[in-house]
Amino acid sequence: MTSPASGVPEPADPKARLAELVERLAAADAAYYRDDAPIMDDAAYDALRREAESLRAAHPDLAAALDQVGAAPSGAFGKVRHRLPMLSLDNVFEPADFVEFCASIRRFLGLGAAPLAFVAEPKIDGLSISLTYENRRFVRGATRGDGTEGEDVTENLRTLRELPATLPDDAPDFIEIRGEVYMTKTDFITLNQGQARQFANPRNAAAGSLRQLDPAVTASRRLSLFAYARGAASQAVGETHWDYLAILRRWGFPVNPLAERVSEAGAEPFQRSIGERRAGLDYDIDGVVYKIDDLALQERLGFAGRAPRWAVAWKFPAERALTTLLGIDIQVGRTGALTPRARLDPVNVGGVLVSHATLHNEDEIARKDVRIGDTVELQRAGDVIPQILRALPERRPADSVPFVFPDHCPVCGALAIRPAGEVVRRCTGGLSCPAQVVERLIHFCSRLAFDIEGMGEKTVQEFHGLGWLESPADIFTLRDREAAIAALEGWGEVSARKLIAAIDARRRISLARFIYALGIRRIGEQNAKLLARHYSSYAVWRRQMEEAGVIGSDARLELGSISGIGPSIAEELAGFFAEPHNRDLLDRLVPMLTIEDEVAAAGGALAGKTIVFTGTLESLTRPEAKARAEALGARVTESVSKKTDFVVVGADAGSKAAKAASLGVTVLSEAEFRSLAGLPPG
């Protein structure tokens, strides 16, 4: 008997033959994908694969065997900490926005009207990755993740034929190269033709393909790569970004051929040109990235929050569409805010199927006179949440009525009040409101907080409904319920064990993440980092926050003087710690964790020091001096106190210099600060 699919005679023992084929194919996969040393050519591999598939089709009882073919799955992806953070970019949408971006660079550097030179590159709509080479060999690849820590996808990246396995002898001993993994439109169409469940767009397809547990699946998806940025390196590579791209090309990396050097005045024409060519490209782009070309200027500009000061993404005009508003749902957030969300008849906007949009607040609904049943114009710009631009009154149903915003919480029924001067209405139910409890728990487990795998919205809601989760501390007692979790529908012992392991893996956390995870109003990721950097340890932070509850106390004044915090945020923090139930939560939670101290940048004279700048500096702008000090591990505050280590004085220093002298605080000249900061004489 001959197998019709493969043309190979039916073996006497199909099970034994299939086992042999599985073993040979697995060895070939491992050699090709992991060792970069193929042991058979493509034709031989394909013939064995076809024979194995034919045997499986003829013998359904053996169907599971071939599923093992491929390099051994990596299991859950490990975590990789980036030596230099992989940050996102700020966006601009109009020429005036770009002009202001350029002006902000000049202000920061004190450049006056000096012209700026950029490198412009199409912004690929894919998945950002970091490629690490040690001793000129590719050793590790990671996704961006939260910018600080990503997922280890090394074995999957090895399957990209465009990725150099080694670098030339002139490359540094250590270097991180950043780039974008994407899928061409052609390959996306081909992939979807063979998929039972289709991907919505090439970006989703690329992300899903790179995160396959089996590298063989990734290899079959035909992913592509563009390299475009630098991470950490043991030595400098080029003096300009344009030089760097040329070096990457010489090393064998694919670099976008549409990248160009442009002047400040040339940015707008280049933006128009790429926009006109966009539809004809075989890959999706959603704008153009403009980077300061001079790497020395990039170094001086540094970073602000989650984005570099030296680069910006100029996004293409927002995509728009018309659809029907089916309903307005009121969501209750972790701080009690009632937020309206539009429920829409699903519509494709820029390649993404949109079924919900933001309505911001009750004033916005009234201003736009948006009503249920209206035909509305929807806009989606880049990664921004879709929003309703306007309603079309001429298409409005005859029985339509204005939307009435609720004055009671839709979840717990408590009164929802709107404080004077605020646009948000808030539920007064506090911790008695199930929605607030659930949202706080979801926030606690989220990616930028404790990042607990498996503790998503659905799981949190289920466990809260069972009475297992009322506060974050309860998460770390779920080990006692492992058997009960395993018994739940859709779980089982393996899933329960993985969840408990994921929770245990997050018992150690940085101070900044811990502060953010608490969900204190107005304490986002950046403010949490500011607080962690300033107070260094959990014990000090908590003690100071409790003391800051007394208006006029040294602790309150110090908190309000932290650059970026200010009095209003200080009031929110003091209010949080004034609540007994919040202190009780911390008393339960903290003993179950290891909260890492914030480690100041090592080795410098400014590390861990508190600095105040006053007066006009000559060789540095105030923002540049502040950024330099913070990059070296210093804490910059606005007012002088006994805890201040240095006051840096410029011209017309005023009262702060006098107060420093009266308190015995060290006063530094600008030249002395430059020396401590490792800068050459100005």
UniProtKB/Swiss-Prot annotation:
GO terms for cellular component: cytosol. GO terms for molecular function: DNA ligase (NAD+) activity; metal ion binding. Zn(2+) binds at residues 409, 412, 427, 433. NAD(+) binds at residues 42-46, 88-89, 121, 144, 180, 291, 315. Keywords: DNA damage, DNA repair, DNA replication, Ligase, Magnesium, Manganese, Metal-binding, NAD, Zinc. It catalyses: NAD(+) + (deoxyribonucleotide)n-3'-hydroxyl + 5'-phospho-(deoxyribonucleotide)m = (deoxyribonucleotide)n+m + AMP + beta-nicotinamide D-nucleotide. Residues 601-682 form the BRCT domain. Its cofactor is Mg(2+); Mn(2+). The active site is at 123 (n6-amp-lysine intermediate). DNA ligase that catalyzes the formation of phosphodiester linkages between 5'-phosphoryl and 3'-hydroxyl groups in double-stranded DNA using NAD as a coenzyme and as the energy source for the reaction. It is essential for DNA replication and repair of damaged DNA. Belongs to the NAD-dependent DNA ligase family. LigA subfamily. NCBIfam families: dnlj, PRK07956.1. This is DNA ligase. It comes from Acidiphilium cryptum (strain JF-5).
